[in-house]
């Protein structure tokens, strides 16, 4: 291999070479490719495209020209890079969803909001828009500097005159080396108003500027949430602006709703947004959506329709879509632009100041250019006036000259004319020697003198020049200004949670034996006197019945503890609200239960982070455990282990405690043990627990509750055959944990085994639920108080094969008292005896009739009322059985 001549070898340290070369490359990218100029808001490629369009005469009043022709001309003369990069830049300037004020008028397929690419450049055509002319206006009047192109054969503008603030009007985005810019678009009317205010008050604050410029105005419209992000971006040049789609909830008949999206955030790909929603629905991360379709068209504009299931809350679904999809996103503002050829982070005021200074420079240079041209013309006219005053001598001198040069020299010497004046006289046509032409020259000369005076005044007085800038900006505002598209909504949207959209109200959540769940307003159930038939609380399936019921607020948490010792969590409003007769939805649609897993206890909790509360667990085999409530604050959708136990055991109940309670554990054979909660050491969430009660053969735990020391509460015992009683808590002595307990009721064939042992104050209502789905709500105070060994009194009359499945306490409220007053009234008979009138109702369910009857009895004759009521119940059951037989036939 031949060696290179020594003179062509330049040894350099590789570290220095890499550093300098990379810096050169970085500056080239920053200055010549990625960042816009603060004055015209354009990158070099955009500036070259617009200048190329102007040079080719592709104005709005001319016909479209092929995009390939435009790209080729720009690439050959000004931008020696790939044709694709030039075409993509031109396409973006033509998209009305990318530019607030498009600078290219495209004809053909220039892409869509779904991310579809534009057609090939050989198919599309383009020309300038009307507003683009304002960027280029006066470019040929020495208003800006021109520089050599890449090969030195052409001249190109270093910046455009930009008669409107394009940097903020259309925004900019670009990634350079070590820095990036992202400037949002704005409303032209607001921007020019801001520039006008700045020109009148150079010390104006950004807060005052924001009175004119409310915030970004995106071409896709949509919403901006709050002004804090806008204010931060305008003050510092950096900030995050929350953008949200415009969506409305429409009724579509049959109690169903749909969500209709008509505007989406800026730079969001609509097709990908729809795919994201579909993915969340498919992965069951968002529930309640039945259909999703894109109905966007040229006639309707953007229209994405989301159909919502009948039992779902459209507001909650929409809020979740905002959180998990591009329906709501942010725009990261980073206002970096080239200032005097160097990248700089600028705020709103600085951007407007630099633009205003640029406009003053443009107007000043244009004025100077016009002044030069006016003076040159006046100089020529002065020569013509001299020639007209001495026309005979001028003609004689010209006739006596042998050549043009001799004639010009003779005119200059004889009449003291300049070379330009002499040449103008020689070029003058004979027809201008008429009197009419002389008058025209005089008029033009006088007008020029006035015009020159005006131009000199503009240059001499900065305020006059500034007023001219204002007038021209006002003219552009009046011609191209429009209403803002993006609405700025004020409020705490950044912290919006689902419950902010849900009214807080008391509700009842029921769970059936076959694991169907639903919620109802607590007022659905009417208070009735003891022995009432009850209200049909749900239309149960065959062999299904309500097994559990809790009352809570829609904003409270519900903890679901299963027989397998796992815990799940929902908000009250997340359980679908259905009609009273509805069976509910499968609980697996709300909670991801494992196989053979059923809910054993539902607990309503307002604050899961509380350090003062505990959960006490009891299993069928008599094991108990105490654990801090805060251990259960973070429960995911798949649930977590709440307690560990042996395979032959299962969780019976869980209670919320304050840490200073007495624990009551009751069994099906009517044994009850009471011991202090403090004897239970708090254990971890997954711990096993300790022995709470020693069970006799065939016995098992059926109830767990708590009571205060020296409590005036009572123990309520309800048996499977509908009997119950109240016994003071203090009748049950404290004992050591792990004992056999003491007798709490006499169990016979008449009343059956115990199904519920709980504590009451006498101020609650009691809901008793049967396996037939019948719910009775009665006042606990109406239940007789008996000793520990008593069997109790009848609380509800049961039909054949019916038994009490569950019992729940609910708080009395004003609405309940009103309903109770409507159901029970007192009257005075003819003999002066006060009569009790009670309406007993078997409420309407599919296939059943409504049975009502007024029962009259003396006030203290409770046994008489029960006897009449039981007779009524028998007749109701006969009617129901007859109706059932007719249905079978």
Swiss-Prot record:
- Alphabetized SUPFAM superfamilies for the sequence: GyrA/ParC C-terminal domain-like, Type II DNA topoisomerase
Q: What does this protein do?
A: A type II topoisomerase that negatively supercoils closed circular double-stranded (ds) DNA in an ATP-dependent manner to modulate DNA topology and maintain chromosomes in an underwound state. Negative supercoiling favors strand separation, and DNA replication, transcription, recombination and repair, all of which involve strand separation. Also able to catalyze the interconversion of other topological isomers of dsDNA rings, including catenanes and knotted rings. Type II topoisomerases break and join 2 DNA strands simultaneously in an ATP-dependent manner.
Question: Which protein, by its recorded name, is this?
Answer: DNA gyrase subunit A
- Basic and acidic residues biased stretches: 863-875
Name the gene for this chain: gyrA
Protein keywords: Antibiotic resistance, ATP-binding, Cytoplasm, DNA-binding, Isomerase, Nucleotide-binding, Topoisomerase
What is the species of this protein? Staphylococcus aureus (strain Mu50 / ATCC 700699)
Q: Where is the composition biased (Acidic residues)?
A: 813-823, 876-889
Cellular-component GO terms for this entry: chromosome; cytoplasm; DNA topoisomerase type II (double strand cut, ATP-hydrolyzing) complex
In terms of InterPro entries, this protein maps to: GyrA, GyrA/parC_rep, Gyrase/topoIV_suA_C, Topo_IIA-like_dom_sf, Topo_IIA_A/C_ab, Topo_IIA_A_a_sf, Topo_IIA_dom_A, Type_II_DNA_Topoisomerases
